[in-house]
């Protein structure tokens, strides 16, 4: 009888550990090296595929970065963006906000390589996050450490929310700051993330209002003439691939040239001019224009914050076998 109480306490303690374990599994969190036991080569496979695809199709690296934003800003980093219209799901890719997005077909190449190594293990949501990280490196941007994994995939899409949650090309700076703030991203990181425009482009349909019938006075005059050559019609075909790059000097490099351009009034969008002049953001713009290392530091921080937006973890969602369809 003397030992009954200690054994009872020990049994109770073990029960608590079991309950904690169950709770932890059902309510997991993102962590570093999540696949170290279940699929040790996962991150290396993704990196290799991103590199291979980049050398065959250079613009895939830009697509991976854009995918991260479009996926994570809409509700969750859960690969809902990758779902095609099928089995009662309406694809987010149908939204006007997704105009110009491409290279979704190459996600399947990455997923197939992972499925061959570790079937039904690595989520499409983690592919979105890690391919963005590795794509940034291919674009000569920062090598971002501390990208956590363990996301799970949604079982549906949020097409009805895309128009509300993805900023429009002509949204105000205040609106964009509010959007990022709502997912836990501060102003400094927001300014840095907008630096992704360094490798972006804007279709003429979204910028001609700054050129016709009169030129926006905030635009550098010589730059405005260049844009009119790129976009010669005030009413461009909305489906035509007519565009201008944000950065003419280093269009495929994630660097601080974007900030130098907007300080010289050579930004494509209204928000570019606001970013360089608004007292909330102008100091960050000036500092990033002057210091590429500082820009890379803040850009890395912004990407980490963005990639951890409201993920599905534990027993939420699923691990899709094909990123285009729910299981």
UniProtKB/Swiss-Prot annotation:
Cofactor binding annotation: Binds 1 heme b (iron(II)-protoporphyrin IX) group per subunit.
Site location (Transition state stabilizer): 66
Ligand binding (Ca(2+) 2): 198, 247, 250, 255
Gene name of the encoded protein: PER21
Protein role: Removal of H(2)O(2), oxidation of toxic reductants, biosynthesis and degradation of lignin, suberization, auxin catabolism, response to environmental stresses such as wounding, pathogen attack and oxidative stress. These functions might be dependent on each isozyme/isoform in each plant tissue.
Family according to the record: Belongs to the peroxidase family. Classical plant (class III) peroxidase subfamily.
Cofactor dependency: heme b; Ca(2+)
Superkingdom of this protein's organism: Eukaryota
Disulfide bonds: 39-118, 72-77, 124-323, 204-231
GO term, biological process aspect, one: defense response to fungus
Induction / repression: Late induced after mechanical wounding. Enhanced expression following incompatible bacterial pathogen attack. Expressed under a diurnal rhythm (circadian clock control).
PROSITE patterns: PEROXIDASE_4
Record's protein name: Peroxidase 21
Glycosylation sites: 170
EC number of this enzyme: 1.11.1.7
Annotated residues for binding of heme b: 197
Originating organism: Arabidopsis thaliana
GO terms for MF: heme binding; lactoperoxidase activity; metal ion binding
Swiss-Prot/TrEMBL keywords: Biological rhythms, Calcium, Disulfide bond, Glycoprotein, Heme, Hydrogen peroxide, Iron, Metal-binding, Oxidoreductase, Peroxidase, Signal
Pfam families assigned: peroxidase (PF00141)
């Amino acid at each position: 009888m003397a030992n009954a109480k200690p054994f009872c306490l020990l049994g109770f303690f073990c029960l608590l550990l079991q309950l904690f374990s169950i709770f932890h599994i059902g309510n997991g969190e993102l962590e570093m090296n999540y696949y170290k036991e279940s699929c040790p080569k996962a991150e290396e496979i993704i990196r290799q595929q991103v590199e291979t695809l980049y050398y065959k199709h250079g613009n895939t690296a830009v697509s991976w970065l854009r995918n991260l934003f479009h996926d994570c800003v809409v509700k969750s980093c859960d690969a809902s963006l990758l779902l095609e219209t099928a089995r009662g799901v309406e694809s987010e890719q149908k939204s006007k906000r997704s105009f110009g997005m491409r290279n979704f077909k190459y996600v399947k190449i990455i997923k197939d390589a992972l499925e061959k190594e570790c079937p039904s293990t690595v989520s499409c949501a983690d592919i979105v996050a890690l391919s963005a990280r590795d794509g940034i490196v291919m674009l000569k941007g920062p090598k971002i450490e501390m990208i956590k994994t363990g996301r799970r995939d949604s079982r549906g899409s949020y097409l009805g929310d895309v128009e509300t949650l993805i900023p429009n090309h002509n949204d105000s700076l205040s609106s964009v700051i509010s959007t990022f703030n709502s997912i836990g991203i501060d102003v400094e990181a927001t300014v840095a993330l907008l630096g992704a425009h360094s490798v972006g482009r804007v279709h003429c349909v979204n910028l001609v209002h700054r050129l016709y019938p009169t030129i926006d006075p905030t635009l550098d005059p010589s730059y405005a003439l260049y844009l009119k050559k790129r976009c010669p019609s005030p009413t461009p075909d909305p489906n035509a691939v007519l565009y201008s790059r944000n950065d003419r000097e280093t269009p495929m490099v994630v660097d601080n040239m974007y900030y130098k351009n907007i300080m010289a009034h050579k930004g494509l969008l209204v928000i570019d001019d606001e970013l360089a002049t608004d007292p909330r953001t102008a100091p960050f713009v000036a500092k990033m224009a002057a210091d590429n290392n500082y820009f890379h530091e803040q850009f890395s921080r912004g990407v980490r914050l963005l990639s951890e937006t409201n993920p599905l973890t534990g027993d939420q969602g699923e691990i899709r076998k094909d990123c285009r369809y729910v299981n």
